[in-house]
Amino acid sequence: MKNLVGLDSEKAEALVVELNILLADYEIFYQNLRGLHWNIKGRKFFELHDKFEELYKDAFEKIDEIAERILTLEGEPLHTYTDYLATTQIKEEKNVSDGTKGVEVVVNNFRTLVEKERHILTIAADTNDEGTVSLMSDYITETEKTLWMLNSYLK
């Protein structure tokens, strides 16, 4: 049986499960970034405050895109923090004020995200879901570049 965009319904349902995990990951990542943005201190305050804001704004957009992709595949996006916390593979961070530690948190979160994005890309390709393939491909390209930049910052 096919869904409204012509994909195998069972395969699309399996993809929705993975996209919901990514959605939960991005929600917790977003909140981690907000906390870093608010709580960062020290000599690198201005540059990191701005960078964390840039990153949380980008994460916010991705959250909406992922939720809408889930809906396009006839799934239901997770939408409560209870569900996010039960589903996420990203650890909540609390009261991080050190710049280096904050960047390390972001790097670790991005590593988790890119691993999940690659996994979803593979499943989407096997499902012939070009919409999700395109979305994940764009995310992976962005995430890899950001990881390179943040790792360079830490050296």
Which residues does each PLM region occupy?
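Disorder-to-helix initiation segments
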Residues: 1-22, 99-102
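Helix-loop segments that flank and shape redox-cofactor active sites
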Residues: 7-14, 28-54, 119-131
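A structural signal for well-ordered alpha-helices, especially hydrophobic packing surfaces
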Residues: 23, 30, 37, 56, ...
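Short, helix-capping/interhelical loops that line the mouth of catalytic, cofactor-
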Residues: 39, 76-98
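Conserved alpha-helical segments that form or flank metal/cofactor-binding pockets of metalloenzymes
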Residues: 44-83
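Long, contiguous binding/interaction regions
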Residues: 45, 77, 81-85, 107-115, ...
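Charged, amphipathic alpha-helical segments and their flanking helix caps
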Residues: 46, 53-64, 123-140, 144-149
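Acidic/histidine-rich alpha-helical segments that form the ligand environment
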Residues: 64, 68, 88-136
